């Protein structure tokens, strides 16, 4: 299952093809961008949902929707288990497990990365040893999660808080020294707490 919640850096056709090439019986791609925006992000905006008052919970917000789709597809196909790739260190394992168990208590949950206690480096070596193709680029040393609501990164140099994050980490921002000399003003119009117009043009929330 591949859920598109606005990951601009992902090639979904390639991901789907790769899943089939390494043995998946099927690879289901769901365009959930508007559902994510209208059913989840809208509520986060209205609630001003910021972790510790500063951090938009972009990754966390998408997990219940992904788990919900996994359950729906599992039921539709008569699956006996749902597998996910969460580690045993992060909070995502809880978000997936709790949502899945709440919606479908009878289904078995498989979490091989957690059960085998694999590090990121071990995951990469495991994939290489079994000829599973990987996209190894500058992002490979980081664990990056991206959707329409935000982008978060961890691992690599970020494990050392005393060090400044390297410039190649950032995918959505422009450093001041690289920015255009001319500024730009944006106008947003809200209705019942939700943005509905950008520069006097009506838009969907996802856009």
Go through each PLM region and give its residues.
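Nucleotide-activated chemistry modules centered on ATP-dependent adenylation/adenylyltransferase
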Residues: 1-207
């Amino acid at each position: 299952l591949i859920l598109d919640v606005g990951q601009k850096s992902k090639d979904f056709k390639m991901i789907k093809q790769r899943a089939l090439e390494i043995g998946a019986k099927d690879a289901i791609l769901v365009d959930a961008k508007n559902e994510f925006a209208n059913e989840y992000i809208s509520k986060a905006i209205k609630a001003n949902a910021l972790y510790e008052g500063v951090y938009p919970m972009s990754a966390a917000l998408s997990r219940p929707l992904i788990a919900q789709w996994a359950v729906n597809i599992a039921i539709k196909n008569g699956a006996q288990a749902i597998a996910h790739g969460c580690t045993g260190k992060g909070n995502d394992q809880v978000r997936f497990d709790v949502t899945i168990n709440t919606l479908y208590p009878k289904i078995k949950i498989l979490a091989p990365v957690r059960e085998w206690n694999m590090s990121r480096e071990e995951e990469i070596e495991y994939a290489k040893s079994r000829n599973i193709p990987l996209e190894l680029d500058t992002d490979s040393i980081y664990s990056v999660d991206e959707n329409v609501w935000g982008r978060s990164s961890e691992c690599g140099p970020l494990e050392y808080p005393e060090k400044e994050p390297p410039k190649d980490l950032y995918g959505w921002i422009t450093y001041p020294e690289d920015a255009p000399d001319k500024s730009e003003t944006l106008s947003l119009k809200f209705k019942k707490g939700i943005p509905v117009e950008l520069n006097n043009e009506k838009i969907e929330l996802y856009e």
